[in-house]
Amino acid sequence: MAKPCETHWKATKQVLIYLKRTVNYGLLYTDVSDVQLAGYSDSDWSGNLDDRKSTSGYSFNIGSGVISWSSKKQPTVYLSSIEAKYKALTSATCEAIWLRRILEDVGTQQKQATRIQCDNQSQLSCHTIQSIMPYPNILSYITFCERKD
């Protein structure tokens, strides 16, 4: 920061106080017999009223513990809710591929497809997307399932 002021100093002190109070906090991951990666993805369509941009996010679990997550405002305005959902699923797919490779590197290869569940009112069926990414043979392991309501 080029010119820190009193507000920055107060914020820094608050962060340090928080860290001091929560130094003994942690996440508990229990031992699971089946290490199956599961993903969840969602996006709101034009959720920001100022610029009409969507926010999308995903999380990935092994057992009951979250191992990866993301939430971010999209850089462009999408024309439909289905476009926003598929862009979110594309990001989640990239993360799933990366996580599967990491799990394989540590000796925990995934034997089944990674399910990425998405709540989507405009599509009421399961899809396997082969054409979004340039490596369709990798995407054969990843199935998108949208919840039927």
List each language-model region with its residue ranges.
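Divalent metal-binding acidic/histidine catalytic loops
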Residues: 1-149
